[in-house]
Amino acid sequence: MGLTFTKLFSRLFAKKEMRILMVGLDAAGKTTILYKLKLGEIVTTIPTIGFNVETVEYKNISFTVWDVGGQDKIRPLWRHYFQNTQGLIFVVDSNDRDRVVEARDELHRMLNEDELRDAVLLVFANKQDLPNAMNAAEITDKLGLNSLRQRHWYIQSTCATTGEGLYEGLDWLSSNIATKS
């Protein structure tokens, strides 16, 4: 009886761990998001060649977030990070209308990978503070998210520099990864 109670208690209150892969085109704001979540402040970034990885503690959950560079020459390396990924954060520069089709193509190419079949998808429609930014509905349309029938997905408007929307995204991830496990 005591052992059963101990197992139940630890399941309810133990820190959960989640492996998150954050990708998107270059200059979408991935590294800014990562360090805003980790440190609570804006850091000066340079283009990521390779990856940054940080553990973000939030609401009794330990998110291990892999931020992988988005330049076209290094996107083929994304697949090396797919294994054991529970949640995929795809960051889009909502102000970059010229490259939203490129973003869509990269997103769908990734989602067709077998290793990501069970990962939930969170899209951060970033840079919402800019006056010409596309809203979440327009990004949903341009990325073809409604065509994702076999995928659990959500889009969250964000502003990496203020932190707006970031924790709402983590809330969605934590409840939706937890229900899938």
From Swiss-Prot:
Example GO biological process: intracellular protein transport
InterPro entries given in the database record: Arf1-5-like, P-loop_NTPase, Small_GTP-bd, Small_GTPase_ARF, Small_GTPase_ARF/SAR
One term of GO molecular function: GTP binding
Superkingdom, natural source: Eukaryota
Residues at which GTP binds: 24-31, 67-71, 126-129
Function in brief: GTP-binding protein involved in protein trafficking; may modulate vesicle budding and uncoating within the Golgi apparatus.
UniProt keyword annotations, A-Z: ER-Golgi transport, Golgi apparatus, GTP-binding, Lipoprotein, Myristate, Nucleotide-binding, Protein transport, Transport
CDD domains associated with the record: Arf1_5_like
Gene name of this polypeptide: ARF1
An annotated GO cellular component: Golgi apparatus
Lipid anchor positions (N-myristoyl glycine): 2
Location in or out of the cell: Golgi apparatus
Organism lineage: Eukaryota, Viridiplantae, Streptophyta, Embryophyta, Tracheophyta
Recorded family membership: Belongs to the small GTPase superfamily. Arf family.
Alphabetized PROSITE patterns for the sequence: ARF (PS51417)
Protein name per its UniProtKB record: ADP-ribosylation factor
